[in-house]
Amino acid sequence: NNYQMPVITIDGNIGSGKSTILDKLQKNHNQIVSFEPVQEWETYLENIYNNDKGYFDFQLKIYLDRAFIQTRSNSILYMERSPKFTYETFIKVYKDKFTPQEYSILEHLYNNVDQKYNKSVVEPVLYIYIQSSPNVSYNRIKERDRESERIIDYNLIQLLHNKHEECYDNISSTGGLPTFKINSDDKTPDELAELIINYVQGNT
């Protein structure tokens, strides 16, 4: 039998440390993880950051790549970024970059498709929010020096930080969906992975 794999999402701003934490969960704790395919998205990202174009194409690509998962087993899957956080952060920050029709399509995909297609969109059993201050996130982005991210400015990181905070507060205040917030500013990726494993073992 195939079981629906329980999904735990790791959300947070650009530069909060999500990929590194997932890497530690996989290598040190033998967990199944799903990374964002950043290399495949490089050309989309460069078009956005360098030419201020292609926002809708990229969001559609993200949705197709990330909003659905295969049913594989009953093991936990740790997934980088949830559809809900993607919608509430990036799509809302870039709202004026879409035509009204494009925004309406994205809104429909993220908010209606789960009812229409019987909850096919990823629904995490736990949202883990990796909180990081805009300063720390911005410095990490500069340090890792990904080509597509070189033009990112601090204001964007601040805006995205605010949206992530709002999204986390909304999810946790409704009480319907389990959430766990960790600040990554002064912790190593090893410590963060350890905290996540301990929390998940104690709460699932």
Question: Where are the regions a protein language model picked out?
Answer:
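Short amphipathic alpha-helices and their capping/turn segments at secondary-structure boundaries
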Residues: 63-77, 112-118
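NTP-dependent small-molecule kinase module
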Residues: 138-204
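P-loop (Walker A) phosphate-binding loop of NTP-binding proteins
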Residues: 13
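Conserved lysine of the Walker
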Residues: 18
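A glycine- and Lys/Arg-enriched "phosphate-lid" helix/loop adjacent to the NTP-binding pocket
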Residues: 88-166
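Hydrophobic anchor at the beta1->P-loop junction of P-loop NTPases
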Residues: 10
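Conserved substrate/cofactor phosphate-moiety recognition/catalytic segment
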Residues: 27-68, 88-90
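Hydrophobic positions on the alpha1 helix immediately C-terminal to the Walker A/P-loop
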Residues: 21, 25
